Amino acid sequence: MTVLDTVTISTCGLAALIREAPDTTLVVDCRGFTEYNESHVRHSMNAFFSKLIRRRLFENKLDDNCLIHQLMSCSSGCTKMDEKLDLVLYAEEDKPRGNKRRIASCNAPESTAKIMRVLRERLEDTDKFRSVMVLEGGFKQFAQQYPQLCESSEGMTRLPQSLSQPCLSQPTGDGITLITPNIYLGSQIDSLDETMLDALDISVVINLSMTCPKSVCIKEDKNFMRIPVNDSYQEKLSPYFPMAYEFLEKCRRAGKKCLIHCLAGISRSPTLAISYIMRYMKMGSDDAYRYVKERRPSISPNFNFMGQLLEYENVLIKDHVLDYNQASRPHRHMDYYGPSDLCPPKVPKSASSNCVFPGSTHDESSPSSPSVSEGSAASEPETSSSAASSSSTASAPPSMPSTSEQGTSSGTVNVNGKRNMTMDLGLPHRPKALGLPSRIGTSVAELPSPSTELSRLSFNGPEAIAPSTPILNFTNPCFNSPIIPVASSSREVILTLPTPAASSSSSTSSEPSFDFSSFESSSSSSIVVENPFFASTEVPAGSSSISTPSGSQSTPASASSSAASRCRMKGFFKVFSKKAPASTSTPASSTPGTSRAARPECLRSSGIIISAPVLAITEEEDAESPESGFNEPEVGEEDDDSVSICSTSSLEIPCHQ
């Protein structure tokens, strides 16, 4: 607001007028409607909150009689209207402003200064008011120094500063309350009541606020102590507890009485009084709170201060001022009680973890075990428990163990299905996984790879005297190739057939069953590995050896049936062979020879070791019928394709026995 050339009044002078001459003092609040309802000076009025009235006032449309009537009609504290009154105008805090601007609205900050200037000019000319004064510092400074002389309108109160009370800024009607013979609790209004302080012989005051003024009856600074804290959830009041306790103890030894107060006497000052009771009367935080609550029911410290009282209780226990049994919550002190006393472990409810926890393998008397010791268990009631245990032991049959025996024998749970308190639950015995079967891991060396699989191969052929030795196979596992004997002097294609051990030579007319997995011959001088679709083997035409899968029997074939023993090929490729010269030598008497494997054009770069094509056998009529799709080559004729295939590079694997 702008500085006016008129009489000003201080905050102390206005407080004196309100107390001493409220009937002849008219206080006008020139602020807005919202600010007035939040807080204003006691018995003040807000007559010009309407925009219409303000506009008419600025335009000089209100005469003096209407203006005075407007003020008198809104006044509630001034009762002596016939006498001359003292008029006090106030607004917000006085702030210097620059160039004046045009007032945009009546609620702008400049409107309050303009209202005060217009009212002063209009009311000075009347003889109704003895003086027109302006409050120095505005309402903010007055509210800081004299909060007890400020009030709020109903329905527009401030938000509470504590969750435990609707509004802590409003003083209660408890007055000054006696807590101990030398300690009183009160509010800011009580600290300014000199008559009451003199009647109670109170000469020492502790003020827990930052704005409340010092009591006028306290002349010496040694009898006054200020603790600058606010009633909020961030303030720390506990650091002042020891200093306040020493100050109160000094007053008690001197025989003086002390008043502890804050703004309303609800949160801050009761917290300090509770801390003193805790140390002086050796009570826990809960007991001290009830002690003060019984004498002053309006107290309600906020949650921040209540938590600091619990922390102060722990400090007193560590300093051996309070005993563990006197604490409000004894289980919070970990130094005195073991972990098993505070929170016993629970038995898992999951079916997969019923047997996860192992039994206790440590001694129960071990200092590292968190189980309940005999000394701590002795502090609990033992009469009923011992009587119950003795009766249960006596009533139990001899075959059944007692409760204590069952609890001792079981390392996991007791008879009630709960986890045994005596088991050791150290970190090494905690379950690391569920009770599932473990899978054996495979090392890196055991993982299959081309290098490891190739190292397992052996290039040594099977021996003739050990037919049960596993046969080496270099072909694709989808095409199991047999190993058959060959002879260099024969060009006839003969297929050895496995037959059962009990079969005879007379059963050659039946259709044979082929098994390409185990073909072997004792008279073979060379081992040939071939693909069954591209295998053409040279064997003596005079005889052949048919081996059973077990290798126990062989059936020789006659030399005269060499032409009939030729196998007709069935499948996808033709068979090209040369007529073998007549020979009477047996495979046993033939000289060792080699067999050549022709590599077809489509498999020359695949790296598969093959021999001449050997296909499945077809029936005689299928080979001779025109519907078979091919004609049998004449004996003695040589196909050009066969020559070209046989002339290709081959691979020989000799085997020396």
From Swiss-Prot:
Low complexity bias: start-end ranges: 366-405, 542-563, 581-597
Keywords, comma-separated and alphabetical: Hydrolase, Protein phosphatase
Tissue occurrence: Expressed in the pharynx, intestine, neurons and vulval hypodermal cells.
Enzyme class: hydrolase
Domain of life: Eukaryota
Domain Tyrosine-protein phosphatase residues, every copy: 175-318
This enzyme's EC code(s): 3.1.3.48
GO BP annotations, alphabetical order: determination of adult lifespan; negative regulation of axon extension involved in regeneration; negative regulation of defense response to bacterium; negative regulation of JNK cascade; negative regulation of MAPK cascade; negative regulation of p38MAPK cascade; negative regulation of protein localization to nucleus; negative regulation of protein phosphorylation
Keyword Magnesium carried by entry: no
One cellular component (GO) term of this entry: nucleus
Catalytic activity as recorded in UniProt: O-phospho-L-tyrosyl-[protein] + H2O = L-tyrosyl-[protein] + phosphate
Positions of the Rhodanese domain: 21-151
Alphabetical list of Pfam families matching this protein: DSPc (PF00782), Rhodanese (PF00581)
Positions of the catalytic residues: 262
Amino acid composition bias (Polar residues), ranges on this chain: 406-419
Family: Belongs to the protein-tyrosine phosphatase family. Non-receptor class dual specificity subfamily.
Chain's role: Acts preferentially on the c-Jun N-terminal kinase (JNK) and p38 MAPKs. Plays an important role in the heavy metal stress response and in axon regeneration by negatively regulating the kgb-1 (JNK-like) and the pmk-1 (p38-type) MAPK signaling pathways.
Quaternary structure note: May interact with pmk-3.
Official protein name in the record: Tyrosine-protein phosphatase vhp-1
Record lineage: Eukaryota, Metazoa, Ecdysozoa, Nematoda, Chromadorea
